[in-house]
């Protein structure tokens, strides 16, 4: 949640991002061009979808072994793999972090990678995805990301 200066509480990542945009955050998290902005939002939702599928896996793995559905686990891992492949292709185009300017898709992707690493639901996700690894390394060097990294267990 975000507590604004006026004590208003904002929650949900997309609402917080929109609040920051409305406040004129610099650099802007979304491009001024509507189509470019829509492309960034689509990548944001792709990263969010990966987190949703990862959460399904986490919850399924919490069930007793004999009640776990292998089909649910496989289906969601496949969703994650396909989505990661799409993000890898976009990251390989080199369009993210141009001139160090962070955007909403970068933030969502960094959060998603952090969640995958924390929960370990997709082992070796990074083996065939060097552009995403490079993006993650760049993001996690930022103070804003480093401050939100969960402590080591």
Residue ranges: model-predicted function:
Residues 1-70:
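GST-like domain detector, emphasizing the conserved glutathione-binding G-site
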Residues 2, 14, 79-88, 144:
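Aromatic-glycine hotspot motif
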Residues 17, 21, 41-44, 84, ...:
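Non-transmembrane alpha-helical segments in soluble domains
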Residues 24, 91-94, 143:
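A general structural signal marking secondary-structure boundaries and capping sites
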Residues 28-30, 96-97, 145:
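Short clusters of hydrophobic/aromatic residues that line enzyme substrate/ligand-binding pockets
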Residues 47-134:
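GST-like fold's C-terminal all-alpha helical module
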Residues 127-148:
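C-terminal end-helix/capping segment
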Residues 153:
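Carbohydrate-binding/catalytic loop surfaces
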């Amino acid at each position: 949640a975000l507590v604004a200066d006026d004590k208003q509480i904002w929650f949900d990542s997309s609402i917080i991002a929109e609040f920051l945009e409305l406040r004129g955050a610099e650099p802007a998290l979304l491009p001024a061009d509507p189509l470019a902005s829509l492309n960034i939002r689509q990548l944001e939702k792709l990263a969010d979808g990966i987190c949703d599928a990862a959460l399904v896996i986490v919850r399924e793995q919490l069930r007793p072994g004999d009640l776990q559905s292998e089909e649910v686990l496989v289906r969601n891992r496949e969703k994650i793999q396909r989505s990661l492949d799409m993000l890898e292709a976009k990251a390989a185009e080199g369009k993210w972090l141009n001139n160090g300017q962070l955007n909403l898709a970068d933030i969502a992707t960094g959060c998603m990678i952090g969640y995958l690493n924390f929960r370990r639901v997709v082992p070796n996700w990074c083996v065939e995805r060097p552009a995403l690894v490079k993006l993650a390394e760049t993001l996690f060097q930022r103070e804003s990301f480093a401050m939100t990294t969960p402590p080591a267990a």
